[in-house]
């Protein structure tokens, strides 16, 4: 890594941290408290972006898995794996922040409606994807199975989106 690249990365990290702090200040200081839901509504500033980032990450898994099966280049498999890891992190955040919001609003931590259940299924599919990647022998067969699972898993996202 060149000195210029290191400096650019350092500046980017500091700008990201500063933007995060400004965003937190805006959420907790300047944004008025919603009358019906109260302060718990502020969790939506984390919950909804986490959901979209999870969906986007799983879309990358979908595209890279198709490209891997088509071109058989390991590079696409690596991109799919990295995106799946990121997607599982954000989907986990969704499944944690959602019940925190739901308890005071609905009076229950979890309700078995279509959106919540299909989001849990999505998370389970991609956790299974990661387990497959880390528990089987290295090889093209593992990558092909994972690619198929990554493609099938993505098919749950339109169902989640339109399940309201």
Could you describe each region identified by the protein language model?
Residues 1-6:
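Short, Lys/Arg-rich, polar N-terminal cytosolic tail immediately upstream
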């Amino acid at each position: 890594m060149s000195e210029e690249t290191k400096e650019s990365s350092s500046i980017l990290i500091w700008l990201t941290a500063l933007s995060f702090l400004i965003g937190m200040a805006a959420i907790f200081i300047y944004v008025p408290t919603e009358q019906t839901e109260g302060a718990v509504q502020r969790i939506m500033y984390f919950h909804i972006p986490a959901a979209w980032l999870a969906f986007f990450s799983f879309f990358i898994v979908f595209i890279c898995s198709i490209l891997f099966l088509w071109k058989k280049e390991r590079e696409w498999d690596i991109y799919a794996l990295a995106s799946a890891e990121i997607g599982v992190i954000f989907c986990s955040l969704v499944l944690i922040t959602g019940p925190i919001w739901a308890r005071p609003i609905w009076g229950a931590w979890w309700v078995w409606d279509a959106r919540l259940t299909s989001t849990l299924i999505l998370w389970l599919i991609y956790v299974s994807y990661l387990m497959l990647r880390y528990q089987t022998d290295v090889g093209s067969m593992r990558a092909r199975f994972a690619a198929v699972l990554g493609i099938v898993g993505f098919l749950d996202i339109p169902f989640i989106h339109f399940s309201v």
